[in-house]
Regions:
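Glycine-centered loop-to-beta-strand initiation motif
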Residues: 77-80, 89, 214-229
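Beta-strand-rich domain onsets/edges
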Residues: 18-35, 117-181, 186-192, 203-206, ...
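Start-of-domain marker
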Residues: 18-73
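Short amphipathic beta-strand segments in non-cytosolic proteins
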Residues: 58-68, 196-212
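Sec/Tat signal peptide C-region and signal peptidase I cleavage site
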Residues: 13-17
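Short beta-strand/loop motifs in extracellular/secreted proteins, especially
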Residues: 56-58, 193-195, 231
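Bacterial N-terminal signal peptides
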Residues: 1-12
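Short acidic/polar inter-strand loop motif in beta-rich domains
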Residues: 97-106, 239-245
Length: 267
């Protein structure tokens, strides 16, 4: 399982590289506990908690034992998620944003984003479309999941039909961490082959290590995991917006961000 570890590179990434993920103080809880989770935006697995604003959310729900529950929150709530599961199992929290947009005034900043996320031959495509290399407008969408162990934490993650998403093919709360955790990255419910997966590994003391992997032909990668650590996986794709789809403000490019968070119990 080859990993490429980064160090100071991630200490000062610009805002275009920010991830959005679902985070909490404890990814393992009992069924009668109230679970509180933040929507966080930042980098290097550190960021600010985002308030609940309905206008920014396309869907936000949690799934446990084959039942789906809509998130109940008030405008401005921090944390954005609060729920008491009431039974044991593997709880999956799913968040999908409405589209937002930003403008890159010059090509260098946009290209840094392209290179960081390994998004392919975007410059060649951009030029071929007859677009200028200034004032590049990008629309972006977030598709974030969190997998929480409740009690005995029996169960499995599954596909939720997001435009892009990670699916855990194992259970990090019950499986042997020495075997690694198999995950799959999807786009429109199909495997993303040879996709870059960015792995953020947070130790109990808050130290974060960052590494990269690539998915295989089936969109699958095996992640090295350690007891007592929390993980954020991130994968981004960039596509030409569909001109026939009213998908938010007009843009030259559209990015889709998949993220999943989970933890591994202490040994």
């Amino acid at each position: 399982m080859p990993l490429v570890t980064f160090f100071a590179f991630f200490a000062a990434q610009p805002s275009f590289a920010h991830e959005l993920w679902i985070d909490g103080q404890n990814f393992q809880a009992q069924s009668d506990e109230t679970i509180r989770l933040d929507l966080r935006n930042g980098e290097n697995f550190e960021g600010s908690a985002q308030a609940y604003f309905k206008s920014r959310i396309k869907s936000f729900y949690w799934f446990l034992n084959q039942e789906t529950h809509q998130v109940e929150a008030r405008m401005g709530d921090i944390p954005a998620f609060s729920a008491t599961p009431g039974e044991d199992g593997l709880m999956v929290v799913v968040y999908e944003s409405t589209p937002s947009s930003l403008t890159y005034r010059d090509w260098a900043k946009f290209d840094a984003f392209i290179q960081h996320k390994d998004l392919g031959p975007i410059e060649e495509m951009h030029v071929a479309r007859g677009l200028l290399k200034t004032d590049i407008k990008e629309a972006y969408h977030r598709y974030s999941k969190a997998v929480i162990g409740i009690g005995a934490a029996q169960g499995a993650d599954q596909r939720f039909g997001l435009e892009t998403e990670f699916v855990l093919l194992g259970n990090p709360y019950r499986d042997d961490p020495a075997q690694g955790l198999k995950v799959q990255i999807l786009y429109r419910d199909a495997p993303r082959a040879d996709a870059q997966i960015e792995i953020f590994e947070r130790a109990s003391d808050g130290t974060v290590n960052v590494s990269l992997m690539r998915s295989n032909a089936e969109g699958v990668a095996v992640i090295d995991i350690k007891p007592g650590h929390t993980y954020l996986l991130d994968a981004v794709l960039l596509r030409v917006p569909d001109p026939n789809t009213a998908n938010g403000p007009p843009a030259h490019w559209e990015s889709l961000w998949a993220a999943v968070t989970f933890a591994v119990p202490e040994g």
